[in-house]
Amino acid sequence: MERIKELRNLMSQSRTREILTKTTVDHMAIIKKYTSGRQEKNPSLRMKWMMAMKYPITADKRITEMIPERNEQGQTLWSKINDAGSDRVMVSPLAVTWWNRNGPMTSTVHYPKIYKTYFEKVERLKHGTFGPVHFRNQVKIRRRVDINPGHADLSAKEAQDVIMEVVFPNEVGARILTSESQLMVTKEKKEELQDCKISPLMVAYMLERELVRKTRFLPVAGGTSSVYIEVLHLTQGTCWEQMYTPGGEVRNDDVDQSLIIAARNIVRRAAVSADPLASLLEMCHSTQIGGTRMVDILRQNPTEEQAVDICKAAMGLRISSSFSFGGFTFKRTSGSSVKREEEVLTGNLQTLKIRVHEGYEEFTMVGKRATAILRKETRRLIQLIVSGRDEQSIAEAIIVAMVFSQEDCMIKAVRGDLNFVNRANQRLNPMHQLLRHFQKDAKVLFQNWGIEHIDNVMGMIGILPDMTPSTEMSMRGIRVSKMGVDEYSSAERVVVSIDRFLRVRDQRGNVLLSPEEVSETQGTEKLTITYSSSMMWEINGPESVLVNTYQWIIRNWETVKIQWSQNPTMLYNKLEFEPFQSLVPKAIRGQYSGFVRTLFQQMRDVLGTFDTTQIIKLLPFAAAPPKQSRMQFSSLTVNVRGSGMRILVRGNSPVFNYNKTTKRLTVLGKDAGTLTEDPDEGTAGVESAVLRGFLILGKEDRRYGPALSINELSNLAKGEKANVLIGQGDVVLVMKRKRDSSILTDSQTATKRIRMAIN
């Protein structure tokens, strides 16, 4: 107060006012501060001061020929005095108004194309709906978010090359446009920008907005996709939020969302196959999302989600060094630990072997709906500060932290046996066993944890075992905070390794991710996901498996045919037949396979018995490990449409219908493709039918007269021998069997003989 009086007193003296207003500022430090460097030190003051002058703008000399010296009101638009230190003209702000009203009109056709991101934003806002404003405490946490809707996902370097190629095509400098997306964008933009008059620099700047993902680390309470982030300032303050529904979607958000769904489906599917890593890679390489190859998206898209990161790790890409447990992302912020195997007893006296982390560590835990700070010692939780959207979310975080702490009271709280399995029916590791157990029911865990009196700390309250808040008591070491915990800000990526069971480890051997961490949430993808891999056929149910399997055989018939005759085992082991096995009743799979393989062997042995349709029809059944049995089948069962349906070994059925005239195959009424048949197949079927019941003795033997035709064979008596002409023009000696034995024994004996006979 005294100081203010003193200043008032000074100002009342006219001399003071004169000194302050008239004296030049010549203090070196001040001059230095305001004149060194190109950076404006006080932009708003500078702007106000400039605009108060008569001619604050400078322009190229040509402007004097394009703008009159005075406007209609007689106000001067530009000064005849040149700008000091340059040969530009000093111009009044009124000149801008004149130009906007009377200046030349140019074509506006390029504006929506160049300023595409702005035009689209206006559309989204126009069609968006703003709801009521709610006043409540906002739990915001800083997350890395995409602030630039509607962009492609090129890297900065790739975008730079595209921009140079589009905007300055004639500039020198090595530019190699390699990726599909680069070439596509370049072609499209060059066409759009023909005869464009907008300044190249502006075009370059706008192109950058369109091609590169820009992320910022911002405090967010609600949706994190870019169409929400662009209105962040309108939808959430410190103590209020406004409901908002975007008036449109942008491809980059759709790509992120669809990528997560595709990755989850692929990881879940790979986890149950014989070789998860090989299957995962095969699926990533053969999948397209919205017409773009998934592997290209993975290389460019920075989305961090468990399944996406497993796919990236499999491709040898770097991923974030944080690890995942129970759906929370853990990042160690201080401390260190060594791992040691230890055997512990559950409350049910079951022995578990757990890897204990010894040492003091601090972590941040970030989940979708809750965040926390965790401090722990060896098998002891020291402190957990949680914040979350609701009671349920807070409870989830507490369970995960309690299990992660490996405390004895948590292990002793287990009631009953732990025998959770993953999708491939393998037992989960002990930590995930415990997690699943308590996620199902945490009552005993919370009751046994112990409670303590708490001090009154600003912004923090206690939480009781029944999840009710309290200011007096709380579960031991656990507090609920009003403030969220920020996501880990660094975008640092580390080299990781992945084993065949899709467990991802950092270079120290710590497990960062495993298929158990992949969310089971199902969603509907915004962009079309095309899985070309046979492993994903079953995603649309059994019918799709059936149709796809037969389509695949028909598409690849030429190679399949050769393998069928030369290397059947390799053919039976093909990945493409794996999904089909789930349709065949488990109990009889082996017998079917044995039967079909023997039938095929017989076709190979008895010349001329090659029957394309039958091979195609029965081939998928031969893929299961065969059981030797004497069983013969006239039809094979597959489980589709909720019941067993029959495929006839000889002849058509609703499941497998081959039309000889049109050569079209329909499976369950769906078109499965056209067969290009072998020319000599017409008669082959007849011959094979007759040759059954005959024993092949060897090469042609002239003593038994001229070769008979197939039809004449039927006149032979049992035990009688004759030469016979078979399909491929070979003549062999046969004997009519003395007794009617099974087709199968027929072919087994014929095997060696026919080869000898022909060769």
Curated annotation (Swiss-Prot):
A motif (Nuclear localization signal) lies at residues 736-739. GO terms for cellular component: host cell mitochondrion; host cell nucleus; virion component. Signal peptide: none annotated. Keywords: Cap snatching, Eukaryotic host gene expression shutoff by virus, Eukaryotic host transcription shutoff by virus, Host gene expression shutoff by virus, Host mitochondrion, Host nucleus, Host-virus interaction, Inhibition of host innate immune response by virus, Inhibition of host MAVS by virus, Inhibition of host RLR pathway by virus, Inhibition of host RNA polymerase II by virus, mRNA capping, mRNA processing, Viral immunoevasion, Viral transcription, Virion. Its main location: virion. GO terms for biological process: 7-methylguanosine mRNA capping; cap snatching; DNA-templated transcription; symbiont-mediated suppression of host cytoplasmic pattern recognition receptor signaling pathway via inhibition of MAVS activity; symbiont-mediated suppression of host gene expression; symbiont-mediated suppression of host mRNA transcription via inhibition of RNA polymerase II activity; viral RNA genome replication. HAMAP family: INV_PB2 (MF_04062). Belongs to the influenza viruses PB2 family. This is Polymerase basic protein 2. It comes from Influenza A virus (strain A/Malaysia:Malaya/302/1954 H1N1). The gene is PB2.
